[in-house]
Structures are given as C-alpha cells and as structure tokens.
C-alpha cells in the first residue's frame, strides 16, 4: 500500500436548486462585489444572468466576463485579470465547465500576485491564498471545482501549461444538476467520458491509495451507470445529479492519485489541433487501455463492470475485454471513432491532411513526456512508445 494523506478544505453543496445558495456562500467569504467568469454560450442561455441576479438581489455588485473560449489561452487570462482589477471586485464566481474554472483560478493568482500565469507554471509556485473563489460547474466533466489545477494554453509554444497549488482550490463548490439540463448531447458526452477517465486513470495509477480508490470506484459506479442515460436525456435530473456527483468524486480521486498517459497525450492534441479536451481523452482511452493491459492486476474487471451493460465474473474476463467495452461506450454516446476524425471535426470544415497531422506527432510526444502524469501510468512509457500510441489512435 502506498503511504497517503488527504486534505480537502472546501465547502461543497450538491442538489437541485442549490444555485440559490450562491449569495449565502459569498457572504461567508465576506464578499460584496463579484467578478463572474463564464462563457458566451451560458450568457446567451440566461444562466449567467440567473446567477448574477441572485447576487444582485442580495445587494451585491456584479461584473461579468464571458470571453472564455474552449482550451483558454494565456491572453484570455490576461484580459480577465485586467477586467477583474478594473471592476473593483473582491471575489470571483466561476460558472461553467473546465475552461471558465481554469481561467478563474488563474485570475485569482495573477490579480493578487501579478505577472503572467506562465510564471506560476508547475507545482507549488503560488505564494499564498488567491482571490476568494466560488466554483459552479455546468457540466459533469472536469471536476475542476474540487481540484488544485489550472490548465491554460500558451499559443506561443502550442503547449498546455499546468499550474498546481492547493491555493487554487475554490472555497465553495455549488453543484446544481438543474444547470446541466441544457447541455447539448455532444457536450454531455465529452464531459461525461472525461469525468469517467479521471476516475479510471486515478484507479490504475501507481500513486493510487485506499482513499483515492474509494473516490474513483464510486465515481465510476455513478458515471458508468448513468452516462448513456444522461447523454440521451439531459433533462433527467436524477441522472444529471449522479453524473455531477461522480465528476466531483473523480476530481477528488485524481487530485490525490494523479492521472496517466491518456491525459498526458490529450493535452498536446488540444494544444496543436484545438480538439475538445474530453473528446481527445475519449479517443485515446481505448488505445491506452490496451497498452496498459499488460500491467493490469485485477482492476480492469471492476472498470469493465462499471461501464458494460452486462457484468461478467472473474473467470469469464480478459483485460482486453475492457478495450472493447470502452469502444462500445464511445460509440453509444457519439464520440468520434479515432483521432483523425476528432481533429477534422475540430477544424470545422478546414481541410487538414494526414501528413499534416502526422507531422505534429513527434512534437506532441515531446510535450506528453513533460507531463508528470506519465510517471504514474501503470505501464512505463518512453517517447517512442508515446509516438506509437499516437499513430495507433489516428
């Protein structure tokens, strides 16, 4: 058993209608003026205004920043930091999926301590507490509301940098399943499978512990048992709450056990080709699961039974059966069949040749090898292994 310790200094509220508790959380932080960071789609849907109105009705001032893109950039963090400073706000509300939360965490750092977010890349470089932050997820995917990470794209390097510090943990997390019901099926699928992969990679990680295992197993049970149902019918509040809670547990699991080759390899795919994070992960998962099968010590059976409609017993199971089950799940929820298709879909009509995609593989492998997640993957990997895995995923 690996030695382990855990630290979760957060207030977490889960349940339908809990968005209404936002002013109460803000008051406990001593806040009077919010900077609400979100995305343009949620603004158009009225979700941003709904959250803002709760704060305004409680007598608080609200400024809104919604210029957050998928795979948010260093430039976006700089713009949001400037907006925060100009507003006079004293706390931040992150409303959305992983992108607004990544930006909000980064702004919490740079607004307080100055400089570029690139200066805080790596582990434990944030000098102290950041601007008080309340996180409200509108997707069941990233688990960012309970993680100590911010992932930002540096276009000058075609690289997704990671800031890791327990100071990034939001003070409050509000998980309201009613906020998930308007998500398109494609978003629900990509985010949901991302959450499942957080749990799966934490579960097979060489850094796994009894604590992270407990979180990961419950996450896989909740997500595996509800993802097909939720993607098919996003207004199903019971399924939405299960997905949201599963994503929460998965976020806690990987905060302690870390991830693996799937995430190490998916970040370069998003940086080079702007493929949605969850889609990149989902396409890579069966390839990595097959690669890691040689290192399985009985955990693949449990993972299989969490996602397969028909459970099996130990004497019926072979590790490669999990690979087939993952591909079946991806197909059921509309995930692209391979990385080439995912990249071309992300280009939205812009032509890209096989040769152009392949020309980036060496650089992507270099970036993947820089990830700390490689170190805890259950099967060791060299650069040439990562290159082969990218080609296999195409």
Show the residue positions of the predicted features.
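N-terminal amphipathic/basic leader segments beginning at the initiator methionine
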Residues: 1-29
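Glycine-rich phosphate/diphosphate-binding loops that line cofactor/substrate pockets in enzymes
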Residues: 20-35, 54-58, 86
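N-terminal small/polar loop signature for handling phosphorylated ligands or for N-terminal nucleophile
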Residues: 43-115, 229-240
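A glycine/threonine-rich phosphate-anchoring loop and its flanking beta-alpha core
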Residues: 112-208, 299-302, 306
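Active-site segments that bind and position negatively charged phosphate/pyrophosphate groups
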Residues: 202-328
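C-terminal charged capping/lid subdomain of soluble metabolic enzymes
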Residues: 308-394
């Amino acid at each position: 058993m690996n030695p382990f310790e855990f630290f979760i200094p957060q207030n977490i509220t889960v349940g339908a209608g809990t968005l209404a508790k936002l002013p109460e959380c803000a008051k406990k932080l001593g806040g009077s003026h919010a900077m609400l960071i979100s995305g343009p789609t949620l603004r158009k849907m009225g979700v941003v205004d709904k959250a803002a109105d709760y704060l305004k009705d409680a007598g608080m001032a609200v400024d809104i920043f919604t210029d957050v893109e998928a795979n948010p950039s260093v430039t976006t963090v700089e713009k949001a930091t400037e907006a925060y400073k100009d507003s006079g706000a004293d706390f931040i509300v992150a409303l959305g999926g992983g992108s607004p939360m990544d930006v909000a965490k980064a702004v919490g750092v740079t607004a307080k301590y100055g400089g570029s977010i690139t200066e805080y890349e790596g582990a434990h470089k944030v000098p102290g507490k950041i601007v008080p932050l309340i996180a409200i997820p509108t997707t069941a995917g990233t688990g960012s509301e309970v993680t100590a990470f911010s992932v930002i794209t540096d276009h000058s390097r075609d690289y997704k940098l990671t800031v890791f510090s327990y100071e990034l943990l939001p003070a409050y997390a509000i998980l309201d399943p009613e906020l998930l019901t308007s998500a398109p099926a494609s978003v629900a699928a990509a985010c949901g499978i991302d959450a499942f992969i957080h749990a799966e990679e934490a579960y097979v990680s060489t850094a796994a512990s009894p604590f992270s295992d407990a979180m990961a197993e419950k996450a896989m049970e909740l997500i595996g048992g509800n993802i097909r149902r939720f993607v098919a019918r996003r207004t199903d509040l019971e399924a939405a709450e299960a997905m949201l809670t599963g994503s929460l547990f998965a976020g806690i699991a990987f905060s302690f056990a870390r991830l693996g080759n799937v995430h190490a390899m998916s970040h370069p795919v998003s940086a080079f080709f702007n493929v949605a994070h969850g889609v990149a992960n989902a396409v890579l998962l069966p390839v990595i699961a097959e690669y890691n099968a040689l290192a399985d010590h009985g955990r693949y059976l449990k993972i299989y039974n969490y996602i397969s409609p028909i459970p099996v017993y130990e004497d019926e199971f072979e590790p490669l059966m999990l690979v087939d089950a993952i591909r079946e799940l991806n197909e059921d929820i509309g995930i692209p069949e391979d990385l080439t298709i995912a990249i071309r879909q992300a280009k939205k009509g812009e032509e890209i040749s096989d040769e152009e995609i392949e020309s980036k593989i060496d650089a992507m492998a270099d970036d993947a090898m820089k990830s700390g997640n490689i170190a805890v993957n259950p099967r060791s990997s060299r650069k040439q292994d990562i290159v082969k895995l990218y080609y296999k995923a195409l």
